[in-house]
């Protein structure tokens, strides 16, 4: 018997209830976001949400989240948001091969260079052992690269990329404004 499953359901139910109750709280205002052409200085002008076509409920949840936060002019962040269709790993007929954008092979050494783990002491052999990205990892990477290209082709000085499973902490606006001011 898997004892973790009942607790996962309980936690999931409690979390969904909490998200519903949050909708009764006042909307947050975040000065870090603004429409293009604003004269208020450097602000995030566009939000891109990566969402699979086969996951419309996740897009609906994101829309609800983005309605909870207001930009510097008092408009919902949803008005600054573009939905970007994610690359679906289920549509790959074969494992994708290396191309100009993505090399599906990496090593533990590559991973530890990007994300150091001080408690991991691998041997030299382990560091150079090739690891193949899963189809899902490749699809995620392609989705992000496609959004980056869209941002580069635009005139947005600053943009935010989100995946469709984000929820905003009740101190999101305050914390982001503070961090943005420090940058």
Predicted segments with their positions:
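An acidic/histidine-cluster motif and surrounding catalytic segment
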Residues: 3-162, 166-183
